[in-house]
């Protein structure tokens, strides 16, 4: 079973503070091609494309200008991404054995790199998968990646009797996986909060829950999809009603803090 996560917009390139293996992204050749296009982007173009302010546009132009796919990356992907998913994953507290297992069972989808192993060393960048970007292959990153990510995932499970993908990525990122080209079964986990008898998907909690489930699967070496219903971290419980073979629903009482506006 292969687990998929989304990346995060924010990144942290402070030192990890421990000795870790640093690997090379499997689709680095495609990244090299893509970086030739992103290097040509102006700050105004980046601002319009990403819908960000002038300062962030200048920062990301500098990142694209400095990006060199032929040079070793700066920090391992699972430690560089900084968002709710990665607060749930807590890669910095995973053991060396856990990270080694994750190298074969976890992939982080990426607009710049396609699919990343947790310990793939990456450069600073921001390039959301859903943004429009003209390349020789089309008008979007979905056009650029085409069926390449799906074929990469197929190769990772080529020897599996029954290939299974546990989709913990957002719709924006999972859309980059060509379902027609993808072999095997896809199981998507959904997380909702219950309040006053109503279930709601609150994104900040759902994102963290995705990371928590990925961590749980890593620590427990989950390879049988039938075991996924046992996930119970953070107060979540599997709900048979509302689930199906390809969609698993997990719910919990909504935390009191959910109604408060974040500072």
Swiss-Prot record:
GO terms for biological process: response to hydroperoxide. One of its GO terms (cellular component) is cytosol. Belongs to the UPF0246 family. NCBIfam families: PRK02101.1-3 (NF002542). HAMAP family: UPF0246. This is UPF0246 protein Mmar10_0828. It comes from Maricaulis maris (strain MCS10).
